[in-house]
Regions:
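Positively charged, polyanion-binding regions of nucleic-acid-associated proteins
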Residues: 183-193
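C-terminal structured domains
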Residues: 451-675, 746
Length: 749
């Protein structure tokens, strides 16, 4: 079956720190030796660096005790032990990544000795945000940095409005900043047409406005910094692989206790980075202590891990099956195009501005003079597929899995009414790779992850150090760039990489995207390739689009980050949603008619399991919360639905492999059902495979057809707001409908 997607020549593997044998041999047993596990130096350091509070609890308890505190600590410890042996999604030292290439045959071998693994160590976003805020609050530290005018500022009616504040000021602050745009602010904005340090700016202000009191000017400048009307070029550090290294280079001529403390922290972090896992406990604790003396934070150190592989090749045949599975999932996805909130905004835009003019972005999104931001929540996507229902009922009646054949695939393709140009231009498919003959006729198989895909290729790899697999990383980055360049040339569209300082400090960890060949819009940071004032919004009959006057082309924003844009600023979200346009996304398999049932059989295409067998457990299935009665009821439910012992418990993006014959595992399940109200149990494949490690695969895919649509003719007319004058007289006439035409002809025309 031919797919509309090509797979990349490269892929990402993600694997846990420990082999599957740890889970199978020790963690499925009723008697787990927690003390021995915690005495293992590698495991101890992994817990220490991942969850410091749990590390403290485990250090201060007797594992033989049966108090509630000890039981809770052991249960949390068990979850982490299971995760570090069964789940590959990157998380500190628990699991890591590596880059691989396609070949004729699959050959993935992960190095067993973790001493060969590589740690990338830097300051955590929680602490880094406090550091930058401190530096921007003390003139001595920012006087030689450049003054940056905040691109978000909207100026109108002699006032400046700013509708967003970053985590550097206050997390989740939703207050609108509004200040008078006086002559001094106008002078500052005009002066910043050229690079200007704060020290030079104060001198210019003093000369221009004849202010002799330098402290008065400094206080005014600090007030602007506190409101983020302006900010410092020190924020460039947030874009760097090693922010602390960048800042220390800037302060190389400083000699005081604070800078010496930063230098010592940096030295200890670089020392810790090259230490073998399991030998860095004392150094890590020393770094935490040094950092906490400067600023208290939720977390202090961010660690990413590169796993070492002996061989890392995925067969081209498997890659081809991934591209076919991606196409099949796209065909089975709901036919909703784009984001529902964007649809509502589009309709309102058409009513107010029409098709024959473009509107300045900042004016459009202003609550004062424009439409403001869409406040509606994204509507849940519904799917009602007769194909899936027929397959479901047939599988249930015959007690079989749901198999989608090539003939089914062809029928779905023939009945498809959505143009392939509405498929994602690029994406990434998440799956787990297994060796074994679980599926007849195949020696290898894939299981598509519950979170199926990303919004664009490159998003998953973005936050990881450029030092990880540098050569292959560069080739992958170039491949992605070439795909978008081809699209740009076909559609007169410029692709821009967008980034911002998030609302929540810890999101700085995943929002970092390293260097890129694309032009950039860095909100709340220096050195953007494009300005917000240059952006305009227009509309066709079916969607909104973004336009740049300078480049005279439409603009498409992408990101190399897995940060959910819903958690970002309203402006960032708007730019991303408009860029996604009328895309039909690759979604997990869901159907309104099937989702209401407690059981769904496995859904498979060839050797790709599109959805594992799934059982849904609700809190109202259990009449008693008393442990023994609850477990008895659970085993009756397990027997009735024929739920296997080896399953994966899933709620949201959280997944945990558990064994239902183990009391400790059932206790975890009970707590989650009572806490969440509902959990899913997914068929687990660890026991059905020959893997010595759980291997997650992230495969970039590209749509073959790059032409997206007929070229849009950009209107030459730019919307200009009518400036009302106070001396105008406004009269509203209310006339009976039957007399309106006569009145207009006789008195108005």
């Amino acid at each position: 079956m031919k797919s509309i997607f090509n797979t990349s020549s490269y892929y990402i593997i993600r694997a846990p720190l420990l082999p599957v044998s740890i889970y199978n041999t020790y963690l499925k047993n009723d008697e787990i030796d927690y003390s021995s596990f915690f005495q293992n130096k590698i495991i101890e350091e992994t817990i220490l660096t991942t969850t410091y509070h749990l590390y403290q609890s485990l250090t201060n308890i007797s594992f033989d005790s049966e108090t509630k505190k000890v039981r809770n600590a052991k249960e949390s410890f068990l979850k982490y032990l299971i995760r570090m042996s069964t789940r590959g999604t990157p998380y500190g030292l628990l699991s890591g990544i590596s880059l691989g290439q396609l070949a004729e045959k699959t050959n993935i071998q992960i190095q067993e000795d973790v001493n060969y693994y590589y740690k990338s160590v830097k300051v955590d976003g929680s602490w880094l945000s406090k550091l930058i805020h401190f530096l921007e609050s003390n003139y001595d530290y920012y006087q030689d940095s450049y003054v940056i005018w905040n691109e978000r500022n909207y100026i109108t009616d002699q006032r400046i409005y700013l509708d967003n504040q970053t985590c550097l000021i206050q997390e989740n602050n939703k207050e609108l900043v509004s200040i008078k745009n006086n002559d001094l602010l106008k002078f500052i904005k005009q002066s910043l047409q050229e690079d200007l340090t704060f020290k030079d700016l104060i001198k210019l202000i003093s000369e221009k406005f004849l202010i002799n009191d330098e402290q008065e000017i400094k206080s005014f400048i600090q007030n602007l910094l506190d409101k983020e009307i302006i900010f410092t070029s020190l924020r460039t550090a947030l874009k760097k692989e090693n922010p602390l290294d960048y800042l220390l280079c800037f302060y190389r001529d400083f000699d005081n206790d604070f800078i010496r403390s930063l230098q010592l922290i940096h030295f200890e972090m670089m020392k810790y980075q090259i230490m073998e896992i399991g030998k860095g406990k004392k150094t890590f604790l020393r770094i935490r202590e040094l950092m906490s003396h400067l600023f208290k934070a939720k977390e202090y150190i961010q660690i990413d891990t590169k796993i070492q592989t002996k061989n890392n090749y995925l067969s081209k045949k498997i890659a081809g099956n991934i591209s076919e599975a991606a196409y099949l999932l796209w065909l089975l996805s709901p036919d909703d195009l784009g984001i529902s909130t964007n649809h509502d905004f589009h309709y309102s835009f058409l009513e107010k501005y029409g098709l024959e003019q473009i509107v300045n972005l900042k004016e459009l999104l202003s609550d004062i003079n424009g439409m403001g931001y869409c406040t509606n929540e994204d509507k849940p996507i519904k799917n009602n597929s007769s194909f899936l229902k027929e397959k479901y009922y047939y599988a249930l009646s015959h007690k079989e899995e749901i198999e989608i054949t090539e003939n089914d695939f062809l029928d779905l393709e023939k009945k498809n009414t959505i143009p392939i140009e509405r498929a994602p231009l690029s994406s990434e498919i998440y799956s787990e790779f297994y060796y074994g003959n679980c599926i007849n006729g195949y020696d290898e198989f894939l299981v598509i992850s519950p979170i199926v895909s990303s919004f664009n290729a490159g998003a998953t790899m973005g936050r990881f150090s450029q030092e990880i697999d540098r050569d292959i990383r560069k080739q992958l980055d170039n491949e992605i760039y070439e795909q978008y360049i081809e699209y740009s040339n076909e559609n007169n569209t410029e692709v821009i990489h967008i980034n911002e300082i998030p609302k929540y400090a810890r999101n700085l960890n995943i929002n970092h995207s390293g260097t890129t060949k694309f032009k950039e819009l860095d909100l709340d940071m220096p050195c953007s390739s494009i300005t917000l004032d240059d952006l305009y919004v227009g509309s066709t009959f079916d969607k909104l689009y973004l336009f740049s006057k300078t480049s005279n082309s439409r603009i498409l924003f992408i990101t190399h980050s897995m940060l959910n844009y819903v958690l970002c600023s309203n402006l960032y979200r708007f730019l991303r949603e408009v860029s996604l346009g009328n895309t039909k996304f690759i979604q997990p398999i869901k159907d309104d008619g099937i989702e209401g049932f407690n059981y769904c059989p496995r859904i498979r295409y060839k050797n790709v399991i599109l959805k594992p067998a799934t059982w849904i457990l609700n809190k109202d299935m259990f009449s008693s919360s008393e442990k023994e009665n609850w477990i008895e009821q659970f085993h009756k439910i397990q027997q009735f639905y024929n739920i296997p012992n080896d399953v994966t418990m899933a709620f949201g993006d959280n997944r945990l492999t558990i064994n239902l014959s183990n009391d400790a595992h059932i206790s975890i399940l009970k707590k989650e059902i009572e806490k969440q109200g509902r959990v899913c149990l997914l068929e687990d494949f660890i026991s059905k495979s020959n893997n010595d490690r759980v291997i997650e695969i992230v495969t970039p895919i590209y749509r073959k057809a790059k032409s997206n649509e007929k070229r849009i003719t950009i209107p030459k007319n730019i919307y200009k707001r009518l400036e009302t004058k106070r001396e105008w007289l406004s009269i509203h006439l209310y006339i009976d409908e039957s007399y309106q035409n006569e009145f207009l002809i006789q008195y108005i025309l």
